Amino acid sequence: MNIFDDRIYIFGDDSRQLALFNLFLEKGYNAAYSTDCFSNNNKKIKYSHHFYEDNLCTGTDFLIFPIPLKKRSIDNLFPFAHKNNYIIGGLFDKELTAFCNRNNICYYDLYLSKNFVTSNAKITAEGAIFCAMQNSTKTIAGSKSLVIGYGNCGCKIAGMLKCMNSEVHVIEPAKKTYIGRNIRLYKNITEVRNIHRFDFIFNTAPQKTLVDDILCRLKKM
């Protein structure tokens, strides 16, 4: 297989997908980019000079989606997908993997790669802390930080904050016996007193944790 002869279709509506599209173009790949993939019409599309709109998806070799990827969010595209497609994304739901297996569509879930998960967590942690520094007049050093969730990203964020001399507090429902020296651990957010006194709060939990009454308390800071 010569990848320069294959077609790559990138779906998504943020700068990461656009950056990936531009990277493929710079490398000479045959790529297209849609910013409107989760609606019933894909009109906002940019193409490389090899792509033709009358053949969208039906001959595409690689379909790259944002993470996470659920079947119901891209159902409008499935009539065009076929066994020659290769779906790439992450955190696929069971419905999507079952559909691909049933229709002999190849797929790859990036989150099945430990190296990808670790690298992605590091990059996400660095980006989150960088954004916090950019948008605050306070420094990380000497600050009081709360990290909600202690999965891959939460662990990396807490570790980096600690290295930058922040007082780190972590909320983790599945209490771990050890998460690092000098890190205060809470089982849930209701155990945290005076939440408004934290200088930085990083929410990595997959469920809604900062509910309205807590956000109202933060607004009074």
Where are these regions (language model features)?
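Short, acidic/turn-prone active-site loops that include or flank metal/cofactor-
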Residues: 35-39, 92-94, 111-116, 173-176, ...
